[in-house]
Amino acid sequence: MLLAIKDFFNSLLLKELFKGMALTGRYLFARKVTVQFPEEKTPISPRFRGLHALRRYPNGEERCIACKLCEAVCPALAITIESDVRADGTRRTTRYDIDLTKCIFCGFCEEACPVDAVVETPILEYHGEKRGDLYFTKDMLLAVGDRYEPQIAAAKAADAKYR
Protein backbone atom coordinates (compact mmCIF):
# COMPACT_ATOMS: atom_id res chain seq x y z
CA MET A 1 0.00 0.00 0.00
CA LEU A 2 2.81 2.38 0.88
CA LEU A 3 4.52 1.63 -2.43
CA ALA A 4 1.33 2.44 -4.36
CA ILE A 5 1.05 5.81 -2.63
CA LYS A 6 4.72 6.57 -3.36
CA ASP A 7 4.24 5.68 -7.05
CA PHE A 8 1.15 7.90 -7.19
CA PHE A 9 3.03 10.96 -5.89
CA ASN A 10 6.00 10.28 -8.17
CA SER A 11 3.72 10.16 -11.20
CA LEU A 12 1.72 13.17 -9.98
CA LEU A 13 4.87 15.26 -9.57
CA LEU A 14 6.25 13.97 -12.91
CA LYS A 15 9.52 12.87 -11.30
CA GLU A 16 10.56 10.65 -14.23
CA LEU A 17 9.90 13.44 -16.72
CA PHE A 18 12.17 15.83 -14.82
CA LYS A 19 14.89 13.19 -14.52
CA GLY A 20 14.78 12.76 -18.30
CA MET A 21 14.82 16.51 -18.92
CA ALA A 22 17.81 16.88 -16.56
CA LEU A 23 19.69 14.26 -18.53
CA THR A 24 18.84 16.01 -21.79
CA GLY A 25 19.91 19.36 -20.35
CA ARG A 26 23.24 17.92 -19.25
CA TYR A 27 24.12 16.83 -22.81
CA LEU A 28 22.58 19.87 -24.50
CA PHE A 29 25.61 22.05 -23.75
CA ALA A 30 28.29 19.35 -23.95
CA ARG A 31 30.93 19.30 -26.67
CA LYS A 32 29.56 17.98 -29.97
CA VAL A 33 31.15 14.84 -31.40
CA THR A 34 29.32 14.68 -34.73
CA VAL A 35 31.50 15.23 -37.81
CA GLN A 36 29.90 17.04 -40.75
CA PHE A 37 31.39 14.60 -43.27
CA PRO A 38 31.81 16.28 -46.62
CA GLU A 39 33.26 19.44 -45.09
CA GLU A 40 35.11 17.88 -42.15
CA LYS A 41 37.13 14.70 -42.38
CA THR A 42 38.44 12.42 -39.66
CA PRO A 43 41.93 10.90 -39.91
CA ILE A 44 42.09 7.63 -41.84
CA SER A 45 44.03 4.66 -40.51
CA PRO A 46 47.17 3.76 -42.50
CA ARG A 47 45.70 0.26 -42.86
CA PHE A 48 42.35 1.47 -44.19
CA ARG A 49 40.98 -0.78 -46.95
CA GLY A 50 39.34 1.28 -49.66
CA LEU A 51 39.29 1.23 -53.45
CA HIS A 52 41.38 -1.50 -55.10
CA ALA A 53 44.33 -0.81 -57.38
CA LEU A 54 46.82 -2.78 -59.44
CA ARG A 55 50.47 -1.79 -59.13
CA ARG A 56 53.34 -1.71 -61.60
CA TYR A 57 57.07 -2.22 -61.20
CA PRO A 58 59.25 0.90 -61.54
CA ASN A 59 60.07 -0.11 -65.13
CA GLY A 60 56.36 0.11 -66.02
CA GLU A 61 55.59 -3.61 -66.20
CA GLU A 62 52.52 -4.72 -64.29
CA ARG A 63 53.19 -6.75 -61.18
CA CYS A 64 50.38 -9.29 -61.49
CA ILE A 65 51.75 -12.73 -62.44
CA ALA A 66 48.30 -14.31 -62.87
CA CYS A 67 48.72 -16.76 -60.01
CA LYS A 68 44.98 -16.35 -59.28
CA LEU A 69 45.46 -16.60 -55.52
CA CYS A 70 43.39 -13.47 -54.97
CA GLU A 71 40.56 -14.92 -57.03
CA ALA A 72 40.71 -18.18 -55.06
CA VAL A 73 40.78 -16.53 -51.64
CA CYS A 74 38.01 -13.96 -52.29
CA PRO A 75 35.04 -14.98 -50.10
CA ALA A 76 32.61 -12.84 -52.10
CA LEU A 77 33.75 -14.15 -55.53
CA ALA A 78 34.21 -10.54 -56.65
CA ILE A 79 37.45 -11.07 -58.62
CA THR A 80 37.61 -12.53 -62.13
CA ILE A 81 40.99 -13.27 -63.74
CA GLU A 82 41.93 -14.60 -67.16
CA SER A 83 45.54 -15.09 -68.16
CA ASP A 84 47.67 -15.89 -71.14
CA VAL A 85 51.22 -17.20 -71.54
CA ARG A 86 53.73 -14.84 -73.13
CA ALA A 87 56.40 -15.76 -75.63
CA ASP A 88 59.04 -15.80 -72.86
CA GLY A 89 56.99 -18.35 -70.88
CA THR A 90 55.66 -16.04 -68.17
CA ARG A 91 51.97 -15.64 -67.45
CA ARG A 92 50.25 -12.28 -67.44
CA THR A 93 46.65 -11.29 -66.98
CA THR A 94 44.51 -10.49 -69.97
CA ARG A 95 41.48 -9.77 -67.79
CA TYR A 96 41.40 -8.68 -64.16
CA ASP A 97 37.98 -7.49 -62.99
CA ILE A 98 36.71 -6.59 -59.52
CA ASP A 99 33.00 -6.16 -58.92
CA LEU A 100 32.79 -3.69 -56.03
CA THR A 101 29.09 -4.42 -55.57
CA LYS A 102 30.12 -7.89 -54.37
CA CYS A 103 33.38 -6.98 -52.61
CA ILE A 104 33.31 -6.93 -48.81
CA PHE A 105 36.73 -5.21 -48.52
CA CYS A 106 38.17 -7.94 -46.32
CA GLY A 107 41.72 -7.52 -47.65
CA PHE A 108 42.30 -11.22 -48.28
CA CYS A 109 43.24 -10.52 -51.92
CA GLU A 110 45.93 -8.09 -50.78
CA GLU A 111 47.31 -10.56 -48.23
CA ALA A 112 47.33 -13.47 -50.69
CA CYS A 113 49.19 -11.63 -53.46
CA PRO A 114 52.84 -12.78 -53.49
CA VAL A 115 54.07 -9.75 -55.48
CA ASP A 116 51.94 -6.98 -53.91
CA ALA A 117 50.16 -6.43 -57.22
CA VAL A 118 46.65 -5.89 -55.87
CA VAL A 119 46.33 -3.39 -53.04
CA GLU A 120 43.54 -1.52 -51.35
CA THR A 121 44.10 2.23 -51.38
CA PRO A 122 43.01 4.81 -48.79
CA ILE A 123 40.39 6.13 -51.23
CA LEU A 124 36.97 6.05 -49.61
CA GLU A 125 35.04 8.46 -51.79
CA TYR A 126 33.89 6.78 -54.97
CA HIS A 127 30.42 6.18 -56.24
CA GLY A 128 28.50 5.00 -59.23
CA GLU A 129 25.20 6.08 -60.65
CA LYS A 130 24.74 2.71 -62.32
CA ARG A 131 25.67 -0.75 -61.17
CA GLY A 132 28.25 -1.02 -63.95
CA ASP A 133 30.15 2.00 -62.61
CA LEU A 134 31.34 -0.14 -59.70
CA TYR A 135 32.74 -2.85 -61.98
CA PHE A 136 36.48 -2.13 -62.29
CA THR A 137 38.47 -3.58 -65.18
CA LYS A 138 42.21 -4.14 -65.38
CA ASP A 139 42.85 -0.81 -67.12
CA MET A 140 40.83 1.09 -64.54
CA LEU A 141 42.64 -0.62 -61.65
CA LEU A 142 46.04 0.09 -63.23
CA ALA A 143 45.05 3.77 -63.65
CA VAL A 144 44.14 3.98 -59.96
CA GLY A 145 47.45 2.32 -59.07
CA ASP A 146 49.44 4.70 -61.28
CA ARG A 147 47.71 7.73 -59.81
CA TYR A 148 48.17 6.77 -56.16
CA GLU A 149 51.48 4.86 -56.35
CA PRO A 150 53.40 7.29 -54.08
CA GLN A 151 50.77 6.93 -51.34
CA ILE A 152 50.58 3.16 -51.79
CA ALA A 153 54.38 2.76 -51.67
CA ALA A 154 54.64 4.95 -48.54
CA ALA A 155 51.90 2.96 -46.79
CA LYS A 156 53.56 -0.36 -47.73
CA ALA A 157 56.95 0.88 -46.49
CA ALA A 158 55.48 2.09 -43.19
CA ASP A 159 53.63 -1.20 -42.70
CA ALA A 160 56.54 -3.45 -43.78
CA LYS A 161 57.75 -4.23 -40.26
CA TYR A 162 54.32 -5.60 -39.35
CA ARG A 163 53.96 -7.86 -42.39
Curated annotation (Swiss-Prot):
Record-linked InterPro entries: 4Fe4S_Fe-S-bd, 4Fe4S_Fe_S_CS, NADH_quinone_OxRdtase_chainI
Enzyme Commission code: 7.1.1.-
Record has Oxidoreductase as a keyword: no
One GO CC term on file: plasma membrane
EC class (word): translocase
UniProt subcellular location: Cell inner membrane
Residues reported to bind [4Fe-4S] cluster 1: C64, C67, C70, C113
GO biological process terms on file: aerobic respiration
Domain 4Fe-4S ferredoxin-type: 54-84, 94-123
UniProt-recorded name of the protein: NADH-quinone oxidoreductase subunit I
Protein species of origin: Cupriavidus pinatubonensis (strain JMP 134 / LMG 1197) (Cupriavidus necator (strain JMP 134))
Lineage: Bacteria, Pseudomonadati, Pseudomonadota, Betaproteobacteria, Burkholderiales
